[in-house]
Each structure stands twice: as C-alpha cells, then as structure tokens.
C-alpha cells in the first residue's frame, strides 16, 4: 500500500483491521479487502473519500449507517461495523468472493434476457 490514503486508513484502523489490498475506488469511496482482527475474518472495508467525509460530517454519516444497519434482505449485504477513526469514516461488510456484475458484463457482454430479468427483479426486491 503505497498511496497516502491507504497508509492513513491503515494507521487509523490498525487496532481493528489489517488492510490487505484495494478492491476498488469510485467517486465516493475506496473499498479495501481487510482482515477483521477481532473476529479473524476477511471483510470489505469501505472508506469515504476524505473530502466527502468532511462535507457529510461524522454525525450524519453515523446516523445514515444506523439506518442501513437494520435493513435485512437476502439481496442486501449486511453491515458488520462502522465508525469514525480520526478523520476516516468507514463501514464494514462481509467480503464476498467473486466477480461484480460490471466485471461479468465486460467479460461476456449482454446477459441473456432471462438472467437480466432475474437480476433486475432481485435488485428491485431489495
């Protein structure tokens, strides 16, 4: 982990999570594969971009995460943990091995209609 954000996140959360590698990065957040040191399991650790965290604010972020924490549905990934450490706002979900829908579409192109319909229905149910 050579980039400054990864090093900062790793230092801020070192007592609870060991960051293994970056899984992805978008406009709002960076997602890392990490080891939950308390429960000895692989997790996906999502960290809000610092500039977004500054605008959103810790209290609002924690309120919104508390709402998300009570959602239960087979097609919604559950929340394991969340918090603020220094200026790092984060939440933790199970790490699910496999490819994303985006990766699948890049690899294979358009989905067969029946499969696209099934996926769309599952997303809508969530």
Question: Across the structure, where does each feature detected by a protein language model lie?
Answer:
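Conserved ATP-binding/catalytic core of the eukaryotic-like protein kinase fold
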Residues: 1-126
